[in-house]
Regions:
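Bacterial N-terminal signal peptides that target proteins for export
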Residues: 1-8
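Gly/Pro-enriched, hydrophobic low-complexity segments
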Residues: 103, 130-217, 221-224
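Short beta-strands and strand-coil junctions in structured, solvent-facing domains, enriched
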Residues: 53-54, 74, 81-84, 94, ...
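N-terminal leader/targeting segments and the immediate start of mature chains
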Residues: 18-58, 213-225
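Short, solvent-exposed helix-to-loop capping segments enriched in aromatics
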Residues: 36, 114-132
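Short, surface-exposed coil-to-beta transition loops
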Residues: 60-62, 80-81, 88-89, 162-166, ...
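Bacterial N-terminal signal peptides
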Residues: 8-17
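An acidic-aromatic
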Residues: 64-118, 191
Length: 225
């Protein structure tokens, strides 16, 4: 449990929000999942804000994200990148280039179900289909404010919920594009990503999601397998 919080940190109001009735909530969800059918690849810049109870000021860093359906992603935090979270197929690496270290996380059959559920929270903004999404999350609230849909979610996995009791997804009201994510941890700390300069379906070489550890890198496996 403790080792996953650094992983998420390495990566996850002008007017009063208006709560939507159930019927409108379903309509918004239907439109969101319909928009996902047109998403094959995605790229964006982001500003990440980490709010910790032990610090009086939040920590702010810039980064870049690449995503390819169904589940490949590359998060680069810092300019130049100080941390890279990279998933391709059934394997994910968290890479620390300056330290020449990396951590390997399996997503396939060798990964414990509890860890798989928790690591999958990294992709909450890109759901594959509604059935899988609703199996993973309970929708706590859906509001509209400042031309943005604000969706509050709770993981259904008890293990994931003990780490992160709530996460929020922000979607543009005009095209349901991902505008931001915010992860709330059990200790009250928060990690928010605000996306800008997003590009829908840019041409991406599959190699940007692949990584082979250089000989001078130390690679560890937190799962011990």
């Amino acid at each position: 449990m403790k080792m996953l919080r650094p992983l998420f940190f390495a990566l996850g109001i002008v007017c009063a929000p208006q709560m939507l009735p159930a019927g409108q909530t379903n309509a918004v969800l239907d439109a969101w999942f319909a928009a996902q059918e047109n998403l094959h690849t995605w790229s964006a810049d982001f500003v990440q804000t980490r709010t910790l109870k032990t610090l009086t000021q939040p920590l702010i860093a810039k980064g870049h994200i690449l995503f390819a359906m169904p589940n490949d992603f590359r998060w680069e935090l810092g300019q130049p990148a100080q941390t890279i979270a990279l998933r391709h197929g059934d394997e994910m690496f968290v890479i620390y280039p300056r330290l020449k270290r990396a951590e390997r996380f399996p997503f396939g059959a060798s990964a414990p179900t509890e860890w798989h559920d928790t690591l999958s929270l990294l992709q909450a903004g890109f759901p594959g289909d509604r059935k899988a999404f609703e199996a993973q999350f309970q929708i706590l609230a859906l509001t509209e404010t400042n031309r943005t849909w604000q969706m509050s979610l709770q993981p259904k996995s008890p293990f994931a919920r003990r780490l992160m009791p709530e996460l929020r997804i922000s979607l543009a009201t005009n095209d349901f594009s991902l505008a931001g994510t915010e992860l709330t941890f059990v200790d009250g700390s928060r990690l928010r990503n605000d996306f800008t300069n997003a590009v829908l379906n840019p041409p991406l070489d599959e190699k940007v999601f692949e990584w082979s550890p250089p000989a001078d890198f130390k690679v560890t496996n937190p799962f011990g397998k």
